[in-house]
Curated annotation (Swiss-Prot):
Source organism of this protein record: Homo sapiens (Human)
Keywords, in A-Z order: Membrane, Mitochondrion, Mitochondrion inner membrane, Transmembrane, Transmembrane helix
PANTHER family linked to this entry: CYTOCHROME C OXIDASE SUBUNIT 6C (PTHR48416:SF1)
Localization, UniProt: Mitochondrion inner membrane
Residue intervals on the Mitochondrial intermembrane side: 55-75
KW Mitochondrion (keyword) present: yes
Family of the protein in this entry: Belongs to the cytochrome c oxidase subunit 6c family.
UniProt-recorded name of the protein: Cytochrome c oxidase subunit 6C
Gene: COX6C
Record's function text: Component of the cytochrome c oxidase, the last enzyme in the mitochondrial electron transport chain which drives oxidative phosphorylation. The respiratory chain contains 3 multisubunit complexes succinate dehydrogenase (complex II, CII), ubiquinol-cytochrome c oxidoreductase (cytochrome b-c1 complex, complex III, CIII) and cytochrome c oxidase (complex IV, CIV), that cooperate to transfer electrons derived from NADH and succinate to molecular oxygen, creating an electrochemical gradient over the inner membrane that drives transmembrane transport and the ATP synthase.
Entry-linked InterPro entries: Cytochrome_c_oxidase_VIc, Cytochrome_c_oxidase_VIc/VIIs, Cytochrome_c_oxidase_VIc_sf
Length: 75
């Protein structure tokens, strides 16, 4: 019996094939992470800022700081 011969591996274009596959996976993963960040972090942060400034009174905050003595030029 003759020993079984293994087929030769395809070496031509090996790096290009692997890079193409890995680039596609990296692109899809980066889009997923960007979407996840937008919905989990950015939108909640934007909502928190909007809620804060909806009820924020500048003059009330200024008067509290003035009474606490933070400003040197305002008596």
């Amino acid at each position: 019996m003759a020993p079984e011969v293994l087929p030769k591996p395809r070496m031509r274009g090996l790096l290009a094939r692997r890079l193409r596959n890995h680039m596609a996976v990296a692109f899809v993963l980066s889009l997923g992470v960007a979407a996840l960040y937008k919905f989990r972090v950015a939108d909640q942060r934007k909502k928190a800022y909007a809620d804060f400034y909806r009820n924020y009174d500048v003059m009330k905050d200024f008067e509290e700081m003035r009474k606490a003595g933070i400003f040197q030029s305002v008596k």
